[in-house]
From Swiss-Prot:
Similarity-based family: Belongs to the universal ribosomal protein uL11 family.
GO cellular component: cytosolic large ribosomal subunit
Oligomeric and partner information: Part of the ribosomal stalk of the 50S ribosomal subunit. Interacts with L10 and the large rRNA to form the base of the stalk. L10 forms an elongated spine to which L12 dimers bind in a sequential fashion forming a multimeric L10(L12)X complex.
Taxonomic lineage from the root: Bacteria, Pseudomonadati, Pseudomonadota, Gammaproteobacteria, Chromatiales
Gene designation per UniProt: rplK
SUPFAM superfamilies referenced in this protein's UniProt entry, alphabetically: Ribosomal L11/L12e N-terminal domain, Ribosomal protein L11, C-terminal domain
Organism: Halorhodospira halophila (strain DSM 244 / SL1) (Ectothiorhodospira halophila (strain DSM 244 / SL1))
UniProt keyword annotation of Ribosomal protein present: yes
Listed GO biological process terms: translation
The protein's name in its UniProt record: Large ribosomal subunit protein uL11
NCBIfam families noted in UniProt: L11_bact (TIGR01632)
Length: 143
């Protein structure tokens, strides 16, 4: 018989840096999960990724207090800001621009995000990432 699912927990945890402090500890603790077991498993799975990059993770909690988790790709805005070397997006994206991104950079980000995007082809994925860039106040060239 399959295990009964109790809850889903969605977090963003820096790659390779999960520890029992907030937000991980309280989120897992309230469901009675072994926090250190998750931290060790998450850090082992994300050790080859760039350290400090926020990784979305969905933790499935079962009724016997066991769990499984699935990691996603880093958020597109984080990858875009890293590509242009900016600290944050623009508060007024239509008037104040924070940087410029080229099509090849967008393609690289789209390849990274491909497993989590619902685009039908790579060109659609690039256009989706370009839309995110424009909404952050980043000039897009070549799209």
């Amino acid at each position: 018989m399959a295990k009964k699912i109790e809850a889903y927990i969605k977090l963003q945890v820096p790659a390779g840096q999960a520890n029992p402090s907030p937000p991980v500890g309280p989120a897992l603790g309230q469901h009675g999960l072994n926090i250190m077991e998750f931290c060790k498993a998450f850090n082992a799975q994300t050790q080859e990724m760039e350290g400090g990059l926020p990784i979305p993770v969905v933790i499935t909690v079962y009724s016997d207090r066991s769990f499984t988790f699935v990691t996603k790709t880093p958020p597109a805005p984080v990858l875009l800001l890293k590509a242009i070397g900016a600290k944050g997006g623009s508060g007024t994206p239509n008037t104040k621009k924070v940087g410029t991104v080229q099509r090849d950079q967008l393609e690289e980000i789209a390849r990274t995000k491909w497993p989590d995007l619902n685009a039908s082809d790579m060109d659609a994925a690039v256009r989706s990432i370009a839309g995110t860039a424009r909404s952050m106040g980043i000039d897009v060239e070549g799209v």
